[in-house]
Amino acid sequence: MGRAKKVVLAYSGGVDTSVCIPYLKQEWGVEDVITFAADLGQGDELEPIRQKALDAGASQSLVGDLIEPFIKDFAFPAIRANALYEGRYPLSTALARPLIAKRLVEVAREVGADAVAHGCTGKGNDQVRFDVAIAALAPDLKVLTPAREWGMSREETIAYGERFGLPAPVSKKSPYSIDLNLLGRSIEAGPLEDPMVAPPEEVFAMTRSVEAAPDASEEIEIAFEAGNPVGINGQKLDPVALIREANRLAGIHGIGRLDMIENRVVGIKSREIYETPGLLLFIQAHQELESLTLAADVLRSKRQLEMQWADLVYQGLWFGPLKDALDGFMDRTQATVNGVVRLRLHKGTATVTGRGSADSSLYVPEMASYGSEDQFDHRAAEGFIYVWGLPTRLWSASQRRSS
């Protein structure tokens, strides 16, 4: 008897998920493998991917358009949270996994499957994200993980697929593993596994090099309402169009490349190359607007919780209780994050040159000015300083007595 009768497999068209199809049927006795591929704006022609799954032995090959919920329900919360894992990575890949897992469970329910499957290996982050999300959403569903259990090297995996007529997808000329969606691209493997090897220009597709970026700078304005980006240069755009336009503008000027050593959930360090031009641009502008519209104690507390929010998403805990509680805090802070931020884009950098909020700014010129319009009561400072410094004076006096 097989491990499951009917399985819905999260499918990307890559080598691991393609080999999963014959492996599930031949080695684990699964009768019916249905694949699900998510359209997250990666730009691939999905019909060839759908057909590839059928050619590999899938009984059905489904494709779901998830672009709009991906941006509205996953990318926008990350922008509101200024989510940067380890202070740098804006979670472009990690944000996609809970959405795919959610839809995978829904498809499994629709077709009456008794299990779901994915092609994640045993040393990556995605296995954690999928397994934990599925367990939270559908604890009764089995999760089959052939790529984690089959013990084959990449070369052996490709050879196994060739036995069932699957073409080898990676050549010696292009040894990189690439994951992409509308938010960005992640590139790893091959020569990049040596952290001293500079990434060649051929691995980038969304951004120009600094050398190829225009010599002239460009100023843009990004508008926000309740913490969400809503327009660029005075033009209101829907969420998907906003991301596309931000990707275009930032990419032209060489903004959005990351080369970092990151700490994976499973405890190892990995070298990752990312392109996330639009997402990084929005987070930078959003942070700047918050500095204008949030009270000091709220801003400081939020900056601390942002790191925890990013950690939870990276670690696959999107559907967990702490992430849910932090969402409530993040959303509550965003009611006043309304306004416009102006940035100058030039040769790989985005520099804030202005920010304004008609109804939510906590910057009061009459209080901040040193000119004749100054309304700050300077005389009140003496009493404030006396009380503020009292604990320090008392502690210093005690130190002098003890010595």
From Swiss-Prot:
Gene3D superfamilies: Argininosuccinate synthetase, chain A, domain 2, HUPs, Single helix bin. This is Argininosuccinate synthase. It is found in: Cytoplasm. It catalyses: L-citrulline + L-aspartate + ATP = 2-(N(omega)-L-arginino)succinate + AMP + diphosphate + H(+). L-citrulline binds at Y89, N125, R129, S177, S186, E262, Y274. Belongs to the argininosuccinate synthase family. Type 1 subfamily. GO terms for molecular function: argininosuccinate synthase activity; ATP binding. The gene is argG.
